[in-house]
């Protein structure tokens, strides 16, 4: 999913 709040490469 695309996360606009977490800008971490591991979060995507």
From Swiss-Prot:
GO cellular component, one term: extracellular region
Expression tissues: Expressed by the venom gland.
Main location: secreted
Domain of life: Eukaryota
Cystines in this chain: none
PTM annotation, UniProt: Contains 4 disulfide bonds.
Similarity-based family: Belongs to the three-finger toxin family.
Protein name per UniProt: Muscarinic toxin Mlalpha
Protein's organism: Micrurus lemniscatus (South American coral snake)
């Amino acid at each position: 999913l695309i996360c606009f709040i977490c800008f971490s490469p591991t979060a995507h």
